[in-house]
Regions:
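Flexible, compositionally biased loop and terminal segments
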Residues: 1-252
Length: 252
């Protein structure tokens, strides 16, 4: 991967010991970027996929301290509100991306395990099949982790966990007194993963849109004005440099 001098310069400004262990990304702005260029939404989604693939490779190759990457690929709200035509196109893109990931040498060389979070049962069977193949291909890896939130909503994740816990109480597998924040965490889609240290959102909107709600209490947030198809390594590094300058207090 050939890097520009500016990217190399920014990399040298990083303290590799202070990189966020868990990076969350909300890649917002594909549709607005397409509209700005007089193109249909599909054009923005295609460009956005290319940006995701490039950013992912950059992180995995150049920022080894980032062990967990969680991408907000499609919110449940977006799934419900997008037209059938746009959803079909997005599902096609997901299938293509996941097939490419399964064959990507870097994923296997660096032992990147892939996971999916969300109401996955709402997805079409052909997409689920491709996702399952990717899961199986990486299930034994444990060096790095790549998580995709699809048909995901943080409130739904919490309510899903509550239902599972309530069922266990009814079956007398646990008592109400045993319910605490750790028990709830262990019933979330994200169980086993530490909370995000840094969440980057592109597109200029300053909100988290129900992303990893249970886990983001002490996450650092960075809002980029760049639309996702405009996002690049320079913008990523600026966000991480900004993060490293912050003093994380964790409520103290």
């Amino acid at each position: 991967m050939k890097l520009s001098k500016k990217v190399e310069k920014l990399i040298h400004q990083l303290d590799m010991s202070k990189l966020p262990t868990h990076l969350g990304i909300i890649p917002d702005g594909n549709r607005r970027w397409a509209k700005k260029h007089g193109k249909p939404p599909s054009y923005g989604h295609l460009k956005g996929r290319y940006v995701f693939e490039r950013i992912l490779k950059f992180i995995v190759r150049k920022l080894p301290g980032i062990k967990i990457i969680t991408i907000y690929a499609m919110s449940l709200d977006n799934f419900l509100k997008r037209s059938s035509r746009e959803r079909t196109f997005l599902f096609k893109l997901f299938k293509e991306s996941f097939r490419k990931l399964k064959k990507e040498k870097l994923i296997h060389e660096l032992k990147v395990k892939v996971s999916f979070f969300g109401k996955l049962e709402m997805l079409p069977a052909d997409l689920l099949k491709v996702m399952e193949e990717l899961l199986l291909a990486t299930k034994d890896y444990n060096e790095r982790f790549l998580n995709f939130c699809i048909c995901y909503d943080g409130r739904e994740e919490i309510s899903h966990a509550c239902k599972e816990i309530a069922e266990k109480v009814l079956r007398k597998e646990i008592s109400p007194e045993e319910i605490d924040e750790n028990l709830v965490k262990n019933h979330l889609y994200t169980k086993g993963f530490s909370p995000p240290d840094l969440i980057i959102r592109s597109g200029g909107e300053k909100r988290i849109s129900s992303f990893l709600l249970y886990d983001v209490g002490y996450s650092e947030l960075y809002f980029s004005e760049k639309l996702w198809p405009e996002f690049d390594e320079i913008e990523l590094l600026k966000a991480i440099i900004d993060y490293e300058k912050r003093e994380r207090r964790f409520g103290k």
